[in-house]
Each structure stands twice: as C-alpha cells, then as structure tokens.
Amino acid sequence: MKIKIIKLTESAQVPRYSHADDAGLDLFAIEAQKILPGASALIPTGIAIELPQGTEAQVRPRSGLALKHSITVLNSPGTIDAGYRGEIGVILINHGQETFQVVEGMKIAQMVIAPIMRAEIEEVTELSATQRGEGGFGSTGYA
C-alpha cells in the first residue's frame, strides 16, 4: 500500500518506521512548544497525506513519552479519514507535574494505517439477549 505525503514546510520530516516490524510510523514536530502541566497543545507536523480509499490513519501516543513524561495524545486514537487533505496535527496533553518542552524534530506520536469497515445501521425496538447483558464498567471484577 502506498501513502502519498506532502511536506508543507522545509523542516517537516516524512513519517517513517523505526524498525521493520513496527505498526506505527513516527510523526515529528516541526516547531518547539512548551506544554504546561495539565495543559494541551496542538503540535503541527508540517505534512499532509493522501490515504487509499477504505483506510484510515490512527494517531496514537508514544509509550516512552507517556512513561517518562506523562505526555499522551489527548484524543487517542485520533482518526485521519481518507478524504482529509489538511496538515496533520497532534493534540498532546501533559498529565505530569512539570512543563514539557517539545523540540523541533522530536518524535511526538505514531501513525498506524488501518482498514475501515462501514456499518449498515438498523434501528430496532430491542436487542438480542446475551449472558453479559448490560454489565459493564467493572462488572466483571477488578483483577
């Protein structure tokens, strides 16, 4: 599968896989930005993409940023639809207690390309019974 990419700025980096078996392509910041504790920020990547029909791109957090700095993608996963042609931006949130400094060229998120399925919606008056029923939100225990 081919993904077409346009660099919107000279400093933009084309997303790339760090390892042969990686699911996600690294996304890079094109500018420095501070994120205060508890705050969020839209970080530009300087790229736009063209996805094949029937696919989406999911923007996901980087585990190292989450573990070491409490930085994650706010709307995780963020969805990029095949018809979108604008700049990809990553909404990061700082769950930590210290200001986080995004630097130009930093890996800020990963982008996973996935197939989509379109559902046919059928409105009904009742749903079929299951063993689980309406149990949710911890109904199966904590362990």
UniProtKB/Swiss-Prot annotation:
Its EC number is 3.6.1.23. Substrate binds at R62, S63, G64, N75, T79, I80, D81. Pathway: Pyrimidine metabolism; dUMP biosynthesis; dUMP from dCTP (dUTP route): step 2/2. Keywords: Hydrolase, Magnesium, Metal-binding, Nucleotide metabolism. Its cofactor is Mg(2+). It catalyses: dUTP + H2O = dUMP + diphosphate + H(+). GO terms for molecular function: dUTP diphosphatase activity; magnesium ion binding. This enzyme is involved in nucleotide metabolism: it produces dUMP, the immediate precursor of thymidine nucleotides and it decreases the intracellular concentration of dUTP so that uracil cannot be incorporated into DNA. This is Deoxyuridine 5'-triphosphate nucleotidohydrolase. The gene is dut.
